[in-house]
Amino acid sequence: MKRILTLAVAALFVQSCSTETETSQVNEKILTPPIAKKIPHKMEIHGDVRIDDYYWMRDDTRTDPEILAHLQAEEDYAQQQMAHTKDFQKTLYEEMIGRLKKDDTSVPFIDNGYSYQSKFIPGSEYPVYVRTKDEAGAKEEVLLDVNKMAEGLEYYAVGDWSITANNKIIGYSEDTLSRRVYTIKFKNLETGEMLADQITGTNGQVIWANDSKSMYYLAKDPQTLLGYQVYRHVLGTDQSSDELMYEETDNSFYTYLYKTLDSQYVGIYHSSTVSLGVSMLDANDASAKFSLAHPIEADLEYEAYPYGDEFYIKTNYKAANYRIVKASKETLADKDKWQDVVAHSDDTFISGILVLKDKLVYTMRTKGLMSMAMLDYKSGQAETVQFDESLYSVDFEKNVDFNAKQVRVSYVSMTTPSSVFDINLADMSKTLLKQVEVVGGYDASQYTSKRIMVKSRDGVDIPVSILYKNDSFKQDGTNPVLQYAYGSYGSTNDPYFASHLLSLIDRGFVYVHAHIRGSQMLGRKWYDDGKLLNKINTFNDFVDVSRFLVAEKYVHQDKLFAYGGSAGGLLMGAIINQSPELYRGVIAAVPFVDVVTTMLDESIPLTTNEFDEWGNPKEKKYYDYMLSYSPYDQVEAKDYPNLLVTTGLHDSQVQYFEPMKWVAKLRDMKTDDNELMFHVNMGAGHGGASGRYKRYIDRAFTYAFMFDLLEQAKE
């Protein structure tokens, strides 16, 4: 657990001592920025030599005393530098958790004769999963009390849980280290007893066959952490006797399991950056083997969903923005025989698909704006679902019944809290089942969200979403701005409501979400124009939006802050190398910053899967291009803005040593006196702390960092 409010250096920040001796004693306790030793490590490829003075910081065992001591010294220094904001952090934290409903419950869903729900008990960090038989007078059963399961552990997460078709056994997965490597356990719901079966080293998915005694799981490679082996496990047997059903030998592919909505098939997704396909087997046949629906091909993506003797398929075949087609069992393996259901459009990007008995429902994006449509199988006509706002996000919620007469969706906008609707398939009427309550009162009419387009340096219009409070927004340069973006992997982050942002917005901040190239906000081309040898567009777009905000007096650069995490942390590293003068402060969360070295090392998790995203630096053209923007390699002796960098020791996605090395190099080379803090969570991974409330400790720390630079970290 992070040490935010209990600081070893708290004595430094008491009232000034009255005597010279007392002052001297206090000053002796003041920590200076940790300076790391240098051990030159030579790396040579393509005739180019790089010297990495901090390569020694990598320790895959995470046990080296010197490395751990240096990380702790960084954390101690960060806490010291923020100690004077302790009370303000507490105020922010209490604000944030105060907006959360303490006894919150999820919308129940009916599955196989039971109603399922999760609940938060006041004061608890974790949910309790319960079910009730779908009949009058039935008593509630506790499936998993995650609070009890997490007792005594610094980190705990349930990855997945699933119940057998006979409703008697629950399988669930748990991670106690934050490396996203899960152990699957089983519990008899009739007796409450745990079964002896345990399956270690998995990606966490629990997929049952229909016989209620066998299940499928995905084993991870212990070094690369890639899921690559699919096994069938039979209850009552040891993991060592499990049957290997599939092994992925191409380490550029991700592998995932799923079960179709009609429960007829167990499937495998085979996914790389440029390919997607599926294998399936009959969930009713214990001897069944997986077979490909269609051969895997480079640059071909397809997902197949059964509908009786046919399949509905979302594909990019002859459709950059995707189309929906159908095929029979006989024609499924021949893409040239697939028949159009929803044709390709240059203007509309199809993002999601749900095949129900009565309607085919799909989500799409037109000029960056989300919508949802329902298609009638008989007529072939589709009708768009109407929502009140123009700037929103809609996606499928948990839909478990193929025969359902309604589709359950989640809806959110920058000013509307997350809401769950059931939409009637017959007349498209909407029933609001729940909207997340903002405790303490929230009036959406006091806030404005809008979408503007910003012209990039190469003439492209960049969508930008903006949120502010009406009575504090001036557009005269006096409002502070937090600008966020991600822009990688084709991941499209739509505008959303986050109650913690109110702690910024209500104090005058403007929140700006730049939908830069590298996502699929404006279709597949928007992604292609922000990857591989076009990656610089991602960074340029962010900087161009920043310059627009300054030019149009949304903000003065003395009040402009930037935030990005993971691949968005790479973005932060690139923009401060390109335009450090633009930003008062930058938050780089778990940042991917040592791009070239990581992508040259195939033993590091995720490397081989991402050659089609960044390029393979073993090819000179990619090496040269990646080197030109790699934040770690491009650190120079110059002024940088104030920086807050974060990591988790057990991060499985971006290893701790990347930001650790980056901070050390920045400390050594930067010429300014601006703040550089490295906030280290010694007990967490890529997603930060586990638990409902703990995450807000870090959020309060981050927000206090910005307010402190504005000299507003006081109440």
Name every feature range the model reports, one short phrase each.
Residues 14-16:
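C-terminal motif of bacterial Sec signal peptides marking the signal peptidase cleavage site
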Residues 18-20:
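Bacterial signal peptide processing site
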Residues 65-162, 173, 253-306, 351-352, ...:
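Non-catalytic accessory segments flanking enzyme active sites
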Residues 115, 170, 215, 266, ...:
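Hydrophobic beta-strand positions that form the internal "hydrophobic ladder"
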Residues 120-127, 150-155, 174-183, 198-203, ...:
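A flexible loop/linker signature enriched in serine peptidases of the S9 family
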Residues 130-133, 185-188, 229-237, 280-283, ...:
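Beta-propeller blade signature
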Residues 147-161, 172-179, 193-195, 423-429, ...:
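Cap/lid segment of the alpha/beta-hydrolase catalytic domain
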Residues 513-715:
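Active-site-proximal cap/loop segments of hydrolase catalytic domains
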